[in-house]
Regions:
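Extended, histidine- and acidic-residue-enriched regions that form the cofactor-binding/catalytic faces
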Residues: 1-74, 79-181
């Protein structure tokens, strides 16, 4: 379904917050453009992209505002593979600007939630098939399984098509070639 990334990221953030007594902010529901070689692309219906600079500025400002309000332990849950380097930069810049402002005690944990799945869980999910890697898991077995567990009412099993594992050349092409997906 549309919104899988922010839905899963929010679900994981809420579960983590329950364990540590944290608070979950509203999700940023847009991200960097999905790449064709990760099973996405702007040709996919509903795909709405932000430029990398926009993501960096948005997340940096939100982190700084939370710190201004007194938060000192922050977590950024990355639920969209292509966001990873932009979120890294946002965290670095937020810390640097906070330190320049004299706020020295803020810590930011940033993680891609899918990297925290237990090996035994992955073995069950991919039983009888090969795990293609996170970069090719866009809307694949893992994401669908997680959505079925967390939001079963949003998964339309009757619309699932087995497209097989994509095979891409070892380079990117701009604009992306939708025939690769």
């Amino acid at each position: 379904p549309l919104g899988t990334d922010w839905l899963m990221g929010t679900y994981m953030a809420r579960r983590a917050a329950e364990n540590v007594g944290g608070v979950v902010a509203a999700p940023i529901s847009y991200g960097y453009r999905s790449q064709v070689r990760t099973g996405g692309g702007a040709h996919r219906c509903g795909t709405t992209n932000l430029d990398g600079a926009t993501i960096i500025a948005l997340v940096k400002d939100v982190l700084k505002e939370f710190a201004r309000h007194g938060a000192r332990k922050l977590a950024v849950i990355d639920a969209h593979f292509e966001n990873r380097f932009y979120l890294d930069e946002a965290c670095h810049l937020a810390i640097r600007e906070l330190e320049y402002a004299g706020i020295q005690d803020v810590k930011i944990l940033k993680m891609l939630y899918a990297e925290r799945l237990k090996p035994e869980t992955m073995a069950k999910v991919y039983e009888g098939t090969e795990f293609p890697g996170l970069d090719l898991e866009h809307g694949g077995i893992m994401e669908t399984s997680m959505m079925m567990y967390c939001y079963p009412d949003l998964v339309r099993m009757d619309r699932i098509v087995d497209e097989g594992t994509a095979k891409f050349p070892p380079y990117d092409l701009f604009p992306g070639n939708p025939d690769w997906v």
